[in-house]
Regions:
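Structured catalytic core of nucleotide-sugar glycosyltransferases
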Residues: 1-133, 137-138, 143, 162-167, ...
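Conserved catalytic loops of nucleotide-sugar-dependent glycosyltransferases that act on lipid-linked
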Residues: 75-84, 100, 104-105, 126-251
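Aromatic- and Lys/Arg-enriched surface recognition patch
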Residues: 255
Length: 259
């Protein structure tokens, strides 16, 4: 990371060609009044539509846009990991590309950082999603909050603000589904974690990437977070435990797919 840029916005993208133009316009409107140097990093996670072509076109229309492209879909953790590595800012904002996260919330996230937080997570207090997404998410958030010891309402919100050092320390944990637990991991590492309510909008284009298989992933995530909590103070143990867990998880997923 390079301190010449103050703010980096990292946005994973998967098949969001229609959302990208209005998203860039909203980002410009939110970021320009801040009067700070910024960059927008789109990570195309193996899109099969014209998302990357749209990003390339937009990079000629807007200043500060950078793009990373995966040849296949590696999922959100990998997209965030490469985004964190590429980010040059002192502050990193993450958000989704589907227009459900509102860029106008970015100044409020920065204000919360100025109050002394190292990571600020958005809370989709009034969520515009079907029950098939909201009910599992509520259960996940409650159990994760109890297990981790950090009282957040919404671990899953993509809209977050990080100080640079939090991103650097989070990189070893950005694989699988562990990106969901970055607030908890930051909390265990001694960083101050805060939360603010943020606007959440209905999806305008495309379709949700949420599927029934993610219900299984949710239960497996709970197992993972239990291992993380137990072994956070003994880093060498966590990799062996998570390795065993990954083998078990892989077996379950294969069995699930075969059904």
């Amino acid at each position: 990371m390079n301190s010449e840029i103050y703010l980096s916005v990292v946005i994973p993208v998967f098949n969001e060609e229609e959302s990208l133009p209005p998203l860039c316009a909203k980002l410009r409107d939110a970021l320009e009044p801040l009067q700070c140097s910024y960059e927008i990093i789109f990570v195309d996670d193996g899109s099969t539509d014209q998302s990357f072509a749209v990003i390339e076109r937009l990079s000629g229309e807007y200043e500060g846009i950078r793009a990373v492209r995966f040849r296949r879909n590696y999922r959100k953790a990998a997209a965030l990991a490469i985004g964190f590595k590429e980010a040059r800012g002192e502050i990193v904002i993450t958000m989704d590309a589907d227009l459900q996260d509102d860029p106008s919330e970015i100044p409020r996230l920065l204000e919360k950082l100025d109050e002394g937080c190292d990571l600020v997570s958005g809370w989709k207090k009034k969520r515009h999603d079907p029950l098939s997404k909201t009910l599992p998410s509520r259960l996940f958030n409650k159990v994760t909050s109890m297990v981790s010891g950090i009282r957040l309402h919404d671990f899953n919100c993509g809209l977050k603000a990080y100080r640079r050092e939090v991103c650097e320390d989070a990189l070893p944990y950005l694989y699988g589904e562990l990106y969901r637990f970055l607030p908890a991991i930051a909390h265990w590492a001694g960083y101050r974690v805060g939360e603010i309510p943020v606007q959440h909008h209905p999806r305008q284009f495309g379709y949700s990437k949420f599927g029934t298989k993610r219900l299984l992933n949710g239960f497996l995530d709970l197992m993972t977070i239990t291992f993380v909590v137990r072994f956070m103070t003994t880093p060498m143990h966590i990799f062996g435990s998570l390795g065993l867990l990954s083998t078990f998880v892989g077996s379950l997923v294969c069995a699930y797919i075969a059904l």
